[in-house]
Amino acid sequence: MQKNNYKPAKKKHLLLTALTSLILISCAVFTLCVYNRSYNAKALEDIRKADSSTGAPVSPPAISDAGGTDNENGTVNPEGSGNKSSASGELHGVWISFFDYNEKGYTRTSFTREAETMLDKCKADNFSDVFVHVRMFADAMYNSKYFPWSRYSSGKIGKSPGFDPLSIMVTEAHKRGLKIHAWINPYRITKDTTSNSALAKSSYAYKWRNSKSPSLRRNVLNYDGRLYFNPSKTQVQKLIVNGVKEIVKNYDVDGIHFDDYFYPYLGTTYRKNFDAKEYNTYVKKCRNNGTTPASIVTWRRRNVSRLIKNVYSAVKSADKKCVFGISPAGNISNLYLNNNYYCDVKEWMGNPGYIDYICPQIYWSFEHPSCPYKKTLNTWTDIKRHKSVKLYAGLAAYRAGISSKEAKAIGDKGWAKSNTVLKRQIKYAQNTGETSGFIFFDYSDLKRSSARKEINNATKLFK
């Protein structure tokens, strides 16, 4: 047979040929690895340069199984913890903010019509949850014992609209099979004024600010042209917790939600401004007791964490099924600056008793120079997370469909290059196996014609 006609010399030749091919392949693989190391070092250096002004976290590009830099739809599995996504179990949410309300207020009929329109749209776009603003500026879009009626309900702060907007929203959301979360800003009192005229005279903010007691006056702080509740004050913490508790007890909400407004940016004089007076009192007490005081940064973080823990406890004591979560700023390095936020998200994520979920606002495209989407999301998935805490991604629907000029103005050209950014962001997050849902900011962009193609491409994944 032909197979028997091969001579030993020819066999040796074939063996040498095979060995040579193997060596060449090995060299090619080695060269590819060296190239990738070189590429990643260069990319890391570029990121460092881009991040030098933002304080953004630095991490190398993700590497795919194929050996090159991971593409936007590639499968990655960064170190993290459980809570894996599943198409059927994901949360698909949208924020309905005070920007979506009418500042002139509503009648029962006009608000009901508005609520029906909003919720019909959310349902049509395959969302499962709505996050509805109920306290924007120490006010209430519901009948509250602790906070005055919002001007977004009646047109004037402290004036009843004659109906209960939150009650209508809860009823209409549940009619459509949507879950509803009451969204609260805990510390913010005013948007751009320090005038007493912006406060309802019946409000705690007004009474404290105009109190004869110096201690009570310190419950409201005037900073950078705005008014804030003092995060360090016990009366403030109790007020915020009571405001949460009444919502969960009186309304069939599915969740309580805080966003990224905690301590304001305090600048280079952060050691001396805002609640520094209360910190100095704390330091004196520590020294009198023979204990070492925490730094002002740690002290402020503890103030916020104490509130978060107390809110969580209040929510669960009122309704164990009701969830509590937070949507902090997406750049985690900024959260740990010495002069801003004071949000110890690693503490909240890594331990039970603080939150049920975290939803960082990752509002950048894949091409952002300092906080590209993949790198930023991976930073969050890498954080140790308790098994009870879910990770969602907050996505920028408001950047969908923007022009090249607009994208250039915000320093994020990736948004103008395609209408599949949100879709690819969702797929990438799902492929990490670490996220459990997404929330879009915000409702108004579901109606914007220039955003529709991008929104449609993304929300088809929610079916």
Listing of model-derived features with the role each one plays in the protein:
Residues 86-110, 182, 187-246, 250, ...:
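Active-site-adjacent "subsite" loops/lids of carbohydrate-active enzymes
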Residues 99-109, 147-162, 223-238, 292-304, ...:
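The substrate-binding groove and active-site-proximal loops of carbohydrate-active enzymes
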Residues 105-123, 236-247, 336-353, 373, ...:
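Short, acidic/polar
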Residues 107-125, 152-176, 238, 242, ...:
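Aromatic- and glycine-enriched glycan-recognition loops and surfaces
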Residues 113-140, 250-254, 351-357, 435:
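Catalytic domains of carbohydrate-active enzymes, especially glycoside hydrolases
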Residues 125-161:
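Aromatic-lined carbohydrate-binding/catalytic grooves of carbohydrate-active enzymes
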Residues 209-331, 336-346, 351, 363-364:
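Polysaccharide-binding and catalytic clefts of secreted carbohydrate-active enzymes
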Residues 350-370, 380-463:
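Substrate-binding cleft of secreted/luminal carbohydrate-active enzymes
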